[in-house]
């Protein structure tokens, strides 16, 4: 199963430090990444139909252990998933700011939905993450 979840993904988790400054914790995981750039035709209308989906195995031993959101807010030990955070396809070694990141990487997802699929066989349990796509022209 891990063969399908072979993409390097960088997670940027937003948090507020003790001085009330916004910070990002950078983490790296393995997962599945799917991106579609497309349109649909609805009668006489063309509708932009872009999609970014990432899936992360819950019990993947290659990744650090997932941290629940409430635990992450207290102590940023590993990684979590929350709306408004970012996933980037690939390894980001030189993160400074979100604006800088947008200039250097093509496939960036701002998380809009997290679904926990924790039923069935343990090796199939996963998080499904969807989000907004950023391109050269702005958020879609």
Identify what each model region corresponds to.
Residues 23-140:
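Short, conserved turn/kink motifs that form compact alpha/beta structural patches or helix kinks used as
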Residues 1-22, 26-29:
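N-terminal intrinsically disordered, low-complexity, charge/repeat-rich segments that act as generic
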């Amino acid at each position: 199963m891990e063969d399908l979840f072979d993409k390097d993904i960088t997670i940027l988790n937003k948090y507020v430090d003790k001085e009330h400054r916004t910070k990002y914790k950078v983490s790296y995981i393995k997962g599945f990444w799917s991106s579609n750039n497309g349109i649909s035709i609805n009668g006489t209308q063309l509708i932009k139909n872009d999609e970014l989906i990432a899936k992360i195995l819950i019990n993947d031993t290659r990744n650090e252990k997932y941290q629940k959101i409430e635990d992450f807010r207290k102590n940023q030990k590993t990684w979590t998933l929350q709306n408004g955070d970012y996933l980037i396809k690939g390894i980001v070694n030189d993160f400074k700011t979100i604006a800088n990141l947008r200039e250097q990487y093509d496939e960036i997802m701002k998380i809009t939905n997290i679904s926990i699929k924790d039923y069935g066989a343990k090796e199939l349990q996963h998080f499904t993450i969807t989000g907004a796509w950023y391109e050269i022209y702005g958020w879609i």
